[in-house]
Amino acid sequence: MPRSADIGIYFHVHMISDSTGETLMEVMRASVAQFQNVRPIEHLYALVRSPRQLERALEHIQAYPGIVMFTLVNAELRRDLEDACASMGMPALAVLDPIQATMSSYLGAPVQGKAGAQRVLDADYYRRIE
């Protein structure tokens, strides 16, 4: 019997960020919108900047298997996350990597690797809002 059009396919999606996670949420939602009757169960882990914070997220991922999307600049945390996901059989996607690699190649400039770099509140920011 065919699946009813109003029944959704539910799946867990885990988003791990060393900043607010806003970028991950937007990318994930834009991607999910391309699939009919797909309903993500969203798990956001924001401001993950220590091994202990990552460990807590990984415990949750193990309890609720699903797709893992991340934006982490810390190489050690990235490696730990990728290794853990591989051992659990979970797909892990570094969302910004292809974009940053392309821009770096085109511009001939290295990626700075600063967590939350787009949301820096500096003197220029405060001058603009005055």
Show which residues each predicted segment covers.
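Non-catalytic terminal and connector segments of soluble metabolic enzymes
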Residues: M1-R3, I7, V38-R39, R78, ...
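Ser/Thr/Gly-rich flexible loops in soluble cytosolic domains mediating phosphotransfer, phosphorylation
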Residues: H14, A86-E130
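Short helix-loop-beta junction
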Residues: A30-R39
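Metallocofactor- and cofactor-centric catalytic cores in central/energy metabolism, strongly enriched
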Residues: L44-C85
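N-terminal loops that bind phosphate or other acidic moieties
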Residues: S19-T20, F35, R49-S50
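Short N-terminal or domain-adjacent regulatory/targeting segments
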Residues: M1-I7, S50-Q53, R119-E130
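Short, surface-exposed connector motifs at secondary-structure boundaries
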Residues: I9-H12, V38-P40, I61-I67
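N-terminal accessory targeting/assembly segments
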Residues: M1-S31
